Structures are given as C-alpha cells and as structure tokens.
C-alpha cells in the first residue's frame, strides 16, 4: 500500500506539470493569436476554441491505442514526447526572427501540443489507479482520484495567474520556453519511476466489441429472437467469450441488437471455435446498449462545455475592452479564470459538507442528489452565467456610449472585476455538472467500457470548443455582432443567444433524464 502511494506521486507530479503547461497555453491563446499572428477578434476566439476542442478530441486516440496496443504507460511516454516537441516548435516560432508571425509554424506547434496533451488525458488517471490493488478500490483509489482532481485544479490556477502574468509581462518566448522546460521535467519525472510501475497489458478495445455486436446482429437480421431469452448466448456459459467483468441483465430496448446473441451452427468453425463477429454474449450486447442509452444525455453536456470554453475566448476579449488597472497593478484579462478555479476549489468541499446533508433531508438519498440531478443543476448555472455576461456587456456598451468611445478601439472605464460573477457562476456550474457527469458515466458504464466513457466525457469538452467556434463564426457572418472594435459591436446579443440555447438544452436534458433507465447487473 505504501509503495503504491509513493509510485502514484510520480504520476501526479507528471500530471501537474502537464496541466500547468496545457492551461498556460489555453488561458491566453486568444490574446496570443491576436498579438502575434495578428488575427481579428472573431478568428482568434474561434481558433482558440477549435484548438481546445481538438486537444480533448485526441483523448479518443489515446484511449484507443492504450486499450488496444500500447497500454497506458507507453501511450503516456510517446505522447508526452510529442507534447514536448510541440512546445519546442511553439517557442521557436516566437523567438526566431524568420519564424515570427508564421501561422504555419505556430499552428504546427499548437496542434502537436493538442495531440500530446489530449492523448495522455484518459491514460494518466487510469495508469495511476493501476498502481493500486483491486482490494484498495474504495480507500486508496478514492484518495488517489481526489488528489488527482486537486492537482488538475491547482495546475489550472497557477496557469491562469503566474503563467499568464509571465506571458503578458515578459513575452511569449519566455512564457512558452518555461512551459517547454516544465514538460521536460515532467517527462524526466515520469521515467524516473519506471522500474516501480505496475503496467497492465492491453485487453482489447471496446470499440471492437461494439462493432462485433453490430456486425453479428446484421448478419442475423432475418432470424427471429427466441421467446426464452435463456437460449441466447450468455457469458457465464462460455467463459472464453467474457470480455468484461460484469454480467448485465438482458433488456428489451434496441431489441434488434439482441440478435447478435442468437446461437446458430454458422457461428462455429469446422474446428469448433467461436467466431466473435457472428456470435456475441448478451452482456456484450448490453455493453453497447449502455453506451447508446448514455448518448442523448451525454449530448446535452456539450453546450455546458461550450459555455466553459468561452472563459478563455470571448470572456477574455470582453475583458480587453474593460479597465484592467487595479491601483498600480495591471490585471491580464485571461487571469480572471482564476475565480472559476478558486470557486471549484472552495465549493467542492462545501458541496459535500453542506449541500449533501441538506439535500438528503428532502430526497432521503444517501448522496443527497442523484448524479443526473446534480448535473442538471450545473446546466441551470450555465444559463445564469450567460445571462450575467449579457447584462455586463450591455452595461459596458452603455458606458462606452456615455464616454464617447463607440468609434474608438479602446477600453472603457468600467473595471474588469465586474467579470468575476460570470466566472464564479461557471465555476459553480462545473462543480455540479462536470463532477456529476463523471460520476454518472462511471456508475452507468459497464466495467469494460469505463475508459471509453472517460474519453466520451472529455469529448464533450472537445465538441464544446467546436460548438463555440461554429456559433461565433455563423453569428458574426450573419449579424456582425463581434467586430474588432467591440465598442461598435453587440457581444451582449451573442451572450443572449447562448443563454437561450442553454435554456433549450436544459429542457432536452430534463426530458431524457426523466426517462433514463438505469443499468442493472445480474
């Protein structure tokens, strides 16, 4: 047990450096694209959202190769090297005269970082948990995940304050150079624990098992399901076909897929071996059904991620046109995300200590709120956050008009500190939605698909970035709400539009959540 904790510190230390470097780029990326690559406001915000989306989309790549081919450790090593090389390219693009303002070099470095950082995300936490025995699941593993989450939060906090301040005051070369050194230290730290790690062999991808169910069901399209479900192929009958750790109860939903478990003579070769592309167990079929049931609810979490993405894109651009002085101190607009992180750090234990006991009195449930109820409350806070941003922008435009700055590309006298409420509201929403979402996916995913569900959770962040980019691009092309001079624009209308979409999204979530049928194990 003690050795497991010691080994996990190598992994937590590596993740800390990875998070500081990743958020150190992401928090200030829109500003970098405007000042170094001379992009306009909409393009910079859209490209920053696209980059953040891609960095989480690549989590699927990491999850696939780790499960199917390389295992978690080798996947982390290889993609950390790519991460490091991307930072080297990015640093050179800001330091070498002939590469300055080179979009190709800058984006090459940025997307190498997106690939390296994203692909390690679903592997790092799983690899840390692998260091503990199964008997430690409820104690040691729980402590590891708590420290792991805290590490990510502290890393984001340092990135949004110290790293952003260095970039704004000492330049991009020094800022990116320090992040490059940090990832080099992370890689060295990871390798230094190599002889102690417990590495599990890859057991095959859940994608393959799901494809087998679809193919087998299609091959038996014209066959009738037996009235007695016990005539279907069960994992307990053929232990060599057991792909996961859990026997799931056969369900009537998506009944077409149940045909994959109909036993027929053509399912066996002449040597008597089973063909997994012709016959699947009922538990294997239920694995796919479990994922399909999650998808409608999963889709509603994408818009929440889109709201979170705006903290480092549109919120930053709004802040640029506000007074960033606090006495003799100049506040970088990107550093306001610190209030989101601080809210998460403070509100997470408050949720356990205060909200759960109060909710328990009303619901009678041990955990107070169900995972879906918790996630739904987070979606509600996304609406309030956007309303707050819209009201603030409307007031900022009013001040710009009063001060005669509508046609001047300068900041108004209104303090940037007025952005704090919208960042705090997003942070509260994350405590409810993001943690509720992860707990829900972990609880409802079959044992053999939990890594896939972790990747799906990360994918919502990716798609949220793309959604923000699409909304920004379309609204500006159609309405022109977000010009380079925001004093002449109507960013408030953009925020109102997103508020309306969030309200519609909450209604869709309530509809599917109220009809969701929970997984039942045998």
Model-derived regions, located:
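Hydrophobic transmembrane alpha-helices of multi-pass solute transporters/permeases
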Residues: 1-522
């Amino acid at each position: 047990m003690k050795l497991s904790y010691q080994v996990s510190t190598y992994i937590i230390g590596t993740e800390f450096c990875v998070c500081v470097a990743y958020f150190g780029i992401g928090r200030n990326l829109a500003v970098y694209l405007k000042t170094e690559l001379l992009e306009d406001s909409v393009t910079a915000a859209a490209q920053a959202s696209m980059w953040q989306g891609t960095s989480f989309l690549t989590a699927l790549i990491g999850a696939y190769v780790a499960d199917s081919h390389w295992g978690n450790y080798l996947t982390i090593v290889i993609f950390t090297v790519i991460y490091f090389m991307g930072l080297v390219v990015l640093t050179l693009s800001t330091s070498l005269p002939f590469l300055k303002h080179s979009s190709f070099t800058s984006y090459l470095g940025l997307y190498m970082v997106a690939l390296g950082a994203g692909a390690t995300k679903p592997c790092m936490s799983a690899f840390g948990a692998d260091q503990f025995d199964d008997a430690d699941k409820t104690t040691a593993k729980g402590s590891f995940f708590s420290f792991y989450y805290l590490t990510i939060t502290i890393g984001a906090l340092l990135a949004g304050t110290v790293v952003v301040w260095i970039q704004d005051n000492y330049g991009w070369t020094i800022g990116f150079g320090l992040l490059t050194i940090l990832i080099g230290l992370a890689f060295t730290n990871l390798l230094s624990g190599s002889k102690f790690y417990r590495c599990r062999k890859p057991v095959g991808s859940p994608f393959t098992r799901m494809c087998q169910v679809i193919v087998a069901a299609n091959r038996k399209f014209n066959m009738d399901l037996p009235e007695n479900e016990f005539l279907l192929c069960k994992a307990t009958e053929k232990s060599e076909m057991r792909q996961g750790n859990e026997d799931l109860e056969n369900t009537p939903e998506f009944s077409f897929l149940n045909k994959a478990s109909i036993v027929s003579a053509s399912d066996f070769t002449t040597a008597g071996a089973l063909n997994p592309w012709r016959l699947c167990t009922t538990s294997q079929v239920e694995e796919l059904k479990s994922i399909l049931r999650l998808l409608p609810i999963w889709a509603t979490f994408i818009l929440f991620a889109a709201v979170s993405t705006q903290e480092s894109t549109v919120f930053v651009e709004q802040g640029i046109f506000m007074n960033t002085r606090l006495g003799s101190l100049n506040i970088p607009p990107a550093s306001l995300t610190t209030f989101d992180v601080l809210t998460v750090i403070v509100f997470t234990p408050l949720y356990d200590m205060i909200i759960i006991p109060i909710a328990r009195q009303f619901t009678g449930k041990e955990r107070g709120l169900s995972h879906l109820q918790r996630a739904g409350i987070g979606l509600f806070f996304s609406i309030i956050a956007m309303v707050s941003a819209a009201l603030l922008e409307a007031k900022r435009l009013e001040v710009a008009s009063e001060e005669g700055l509508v046609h001047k590309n300068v900041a108004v006298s209104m303090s940037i500190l007025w952005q704090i409420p919208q960042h705090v509201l997003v942070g509260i929403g994350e405590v409810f939605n993001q943690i509720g979402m992860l707990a829900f996916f972990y609880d409802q995913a079959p044992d053999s698909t939990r890594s896939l569900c972790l990747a799906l959770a990360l994918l919502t962040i990716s798609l949220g970035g793309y959604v923000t980019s699409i909304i920004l691009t379309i609204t500006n092309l159609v309405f022109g709400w977000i010009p380079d001079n925001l004093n002449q624009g109507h960013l408030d209308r953009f925020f109102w539009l997103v508020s309306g979409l969030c309200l519609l999204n909450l209604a869709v979530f309530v509809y599917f959540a109220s009809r969701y049928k929970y997984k039942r194990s045998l």
